[in-house]
Amino acid sequence: KEYRRQRQMCRRDRYIGKEAIYRRLRGEVPFTLAEAAVISRKMGISLDKMIGGSFSNNAVFDLNVVHHTNTFETYHDILTKYVNAFDNIREDPTTEMATSSNILPQALYLKHDVLSKFRLFKWMYQNENIKCKHFDELEIPHKIYNIQKDFVNMTQQMKTTDYIWDNTVFEHVVRDIQFFSEIHLVSEEDKELIKDDLLLLTDELEELAGKGKYETGNDVRIYISNIKFDATYSYVATSNSHISMIRIYSINAITTQDDGMFRSLKEWVQSLKKFSTQISESGEMQRIRFFNEQREIINTL
C-alpha cells in the first residue's frame, strides 16, 4: 500500500513514465535533485537532515540577503518571514530568545523610525549598486515602518529573552552618525533627530532593565559584557524547534535550523554571561552607571 502511494505521488508530481518510476523506487536509477526536492516537500522529509547524515560537519544556511535590485521588497519579505515564524510559536510556553550583540539589536531599535532609517541608509550607502548618496534622499515606504514595528512586537512575545551587549553598542552607532555628519551626508537637523531617537531608546532600555519584563509580562535579562564581541549571534527556540542567526552585512542575517549549529551557538552565547554583569532587576548601581555613560556618549553628537 505504501509502495503504491509513493508510486502514485511520483507519477502525479513528476510526469514521468511508469517504468521510470519503478526503476527509481527500486533504486536502480537515482532521483534527480529536482525530483528529490518535490518529494521532500510533499512528504515532509528534510533533505537538510538527510544530507547532514553523510556530511556531519556541514550545516545548511539561508542567506536572507537584501538584494540591491529590489531593496525594500526583499527587506520587507525577510522581516515578514520572521514575523510569521514568531507568530506561529508565540503561544508556546517554552519560547526563548537570546542575543549576544556588538551593535544595537534590531529587536530593540527598529520601532524608532529615524534611527532605523539611518541603519538602512548606512547599508545602502555602502552598497555601490544603490544610488542613495544623502540621508535626506532616502524615502522609506510606510509598509517598512509597519513591518519593523510588527517585528519588534513579535520578539516581545518570547517567554524569556537574554540580551548580552558589548559595552560599546551605543558608541558604534554614535561614531557612524558622526562620520556621516562630518562628510555632509547627514544634516545637522537630521543628526539631532537621530540623537533624539537614541536618547529615547536609552530611556526605554533603562526602564526595561529596571523592570526585567516587557509590557507583555515576558521576562527579559540584560547583561553588559566586559569583553568585546566580534559579531552578533542570536537564537530563538522552543522545546521542539529552533533557529540560529548570525548578523552579516549590517542589516542581514544568515540563519540555520541545523541541530549541531544551534547547540554550538547557544552554548557560545550563554557562556558570555561569565564575562558579563547583569543589569536587569538586580545590579542597580551598574545599571545607572551604564545608561548614564551611554547618554554622555550620545550627547557628544
Question: Could you describe each region identified by the protein language model?
Answer:
Residues K1-C10:
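Single conserved hydrophobic/aromatic residue that forms the stacking wall/gate
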Residues R14-Y15, G44:
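A short, basic/aromatic helix-end/turn motif that makes direct DNA contacts
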Residues F55-K133:
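Helix-turn-helix/homeodomain-like alpha-helical modules used for DNA recognition
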Residues K122-F291:
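Hydrophobic protein-protein interaction segments
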Residues A34-M50:
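DNA major-groove recognition helix of helix-turn-helix/homeodomain DNA-binding modules
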Residues Y15-T32, V38:
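Recognition helix of helix-turn-helix/homeodomain-like DNA-binding domains
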Residues R11-R12, S40:
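The alpha-helix within a helix-turn-helix
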